């Protein structure tokens, strides 16, 4: 007899391509039936068969304070009673912009949009408009949304599907995008020496969360900052994932790097669709209505999403919030690593703030190439063993995981116990 999840997936595929509204949700990489979620609270969510899971995707990052936090829910309810959307400015937008600028000092001015893709796309257009140049640099395996010029050897879902690029991206778009190796400062410097005067910007994830978890090295970021300044290119940090996730000031505060522009999302919406891009005021002044770079959005600064974001940003400013979040994430990855050693499984893990990566390899990957050598078959087996035990990990070997403030010791201990059994099962399967 099929489960309710099976029935819903079959039904969804009749009206929605692949049965999902974002590819990774289809479980194509790991196999099996996607779980259709009915509710979530704290560190848990429940599927259509009323099965509870410890959630380690957290809506792919936004649920940093846990699902359905009472303060966030109340803020949304209160805002909704005053109107869902106005298409006109509100005081709440100003307050959110002021708070972002205060928490992220490199951002002097900021504009709110509705998605990370929109924010990254707009930041690129702004950089091109401000510099009068066309070429951009991105890095293999990094994902900055699905805008055409950025789907060139992109990470995330495209890695999951084994495609280096997306169909439908014209050659004329791609030719202006230079794709370099992540964490290779020498290559970056050489490219600038060859064509620095034609490069508008460099965009990078300081903590790449779309080829599992791969932090940038200090030398890589420092070289990037230096050559961008030297050649007049705009340095863009894509902190859609790491912003307010790894530290209150984002990854840039951890690494001591000051970008020209920053892209934010996920956490700043508290679970609702909102993103932002901002940075130096002299660059931001190129945006319409002040300058010639056009950007607009019907739902930009939506009052309900802003309310959810402001409530979340207030909660994460609590004393000790990030220390506790980091400690719990560290406890999780150390526990998983110890369990793998007990089973003699080649495995390692890493974390930054509330983000973590799991690698079926003997050493933590430091580049796209080493990441691609991780054992995806073993990851898939581990994923399903954990899923059967009620622990929901990212359904792809190329996606980072997320811990929330509601993942207490009991939740972490339960997850480690499940991992110990899963690794033992993998070891038994190898012996057979």
From Swiss-Prot:
UniProt modified residues of type N6-(pyridoxal phosphate)lysine: 266
Alphabetical UniProt keywords: Cytoplasm, Isomerase, Porphyrin biosynthesis, Pyridoxal phosphate
EC number: 5.4.3.8
InterPro entries per record: 4pyrrol_synth_GluAld_NH2Trfase, Aminotrans_3, Aminotrans_3_PPA_site, PyrdxlP-dep_Trfase, PyrdxlP-dep_Trfase_major, PyrdxlP-dep_Trfase_small
Family matches, as CDD domains: OAT_like
Pathway stated in the Swiss-Prot or TrEMBL entry: Porphyrin-containing compound metabolism; protoporphyrin-IX biosynthesis; 5-aminolevulinate from L-glutamyl-tRNA(Glu): step 2/2
MF-aspect GO terms: glutamate-1-semialdehyde 2,1-aminomutase activity; pyridoxal phosphate binding; transaminase activity
Cofactor section: pyridoxal 5'-phosphate
GO CC annotations, alphabetized: cytoplasm
Main location: cytoplasm
The protein's enzyme class: isomerase
Protein family (similarity comment): Belongs to the class-III pyridoxal-phosphate-dependent aminotransferase family. HemL subfamily.
Subunit and interaction comment: Homodimer.
The protein's name: Glutamate-1-semialdehyde 2,1-aminomutase
Source organism per UniProt: Janthinobacterium sp. (strain Marseille) (Minibacterium massiliensis)
Gene name, Swiss-Prot/TrEMBL: hemL
